[in-house]
Amino acid sequence: MEQEQDTPWTQSTEHINIQKRGSGQQTRKLERTNLTQLMDHYLRTMNQVDMHKQTASWKQWLSLKNPTQESLKTRVLKRWKLFNKQEWTN
C-alpha cells in the first residue's frame, strides 16, 4: 500500500489522532508546526497566484492588435501607476 505524502491536511489529521491518545505537550508542539506549515503553504500559493496574474496581464497587453506607440505608452503608465498604488497599500 502506498504511503501518503505529508500535506497540511494529513498533518492536521495526525494532530487530531495524537490529541486523542494523550500527551498535551506533544500536541501543542505539533499544532504550532502545523500552523507554520499552513502559513507557508498559503504564502507560496498566493505568490503563485500573483505571478499568474502578472503573466496573464502581460500576455493580454502583448496581444493588442497594431498598438501605436502612444497607446502603448498610455497603457504602460496606467499599469505602472496601478502597480505602485498596490505596492503602497500592501
From Swiss-Prot:
GO terms for cellular component: host cell cytosol; host cell mitochondrial inner membrane; host cell nucleus; membrane. Keywords: Apoptosis, Host cytoplasm, Host membrane, Host mitochondrion, Host mitochondrion inner membrane, Host nucleus, Host-virus interaction, Inhibition of host innate immune response by virus, Inhibition of host MAVS by virus, Inhibition of host RLR pathway by virus, Membrane, Modulation of host cell apoptosis by virus, Viral immunoevasion. Residues 65-87 are annotated as: Mitochondrial targeting sequence. The record marks 66 as: Low pathogenicity. Pfam families: PB1-F2 (PF11986). One of its GO terms (biological process) is symbiont-mediated suppression of host cytoplasmic pattern recognition receptor signaling pathway via inhibition of MAVS activity. Its main location: host cell. Residues 1-28 are annotated as: Disordered. It comes from the Viruses. It is found in: Host mitochondrion inner membrane; Host nucleus; Host cytoplasm, Host cytosol. Plays an important role in promoting lung pathology in both primary viral infection and secondary bacterial infection. Promotes alteration of mitochondrial morphology, dissipation of mitochondrial membrane potential, and cell death. Alternatively, inhibits the production of interferon in the infected cell at the level of host mitochondrial antiviral signaling MAVS. Its level of expression differs greatly depending on which cell type is infected, in a manner that is independent of the levels of expression of other viral proteins. Monocytic cells are more affected than epithelial cells. Is not encoded in all strains, and seems to be dispensable for replication. Oligomer. Interacts with human SLC25A6/ANT3 and VDAC1. Interacts with host MAVS. Belongs to the influenza viruses PB1-F2 family. This is Protein PB1-F2. The lineage of its organism: Viruses, Riboviria, Orthornavirae, Negarnaviricota, Polyploviricotina.
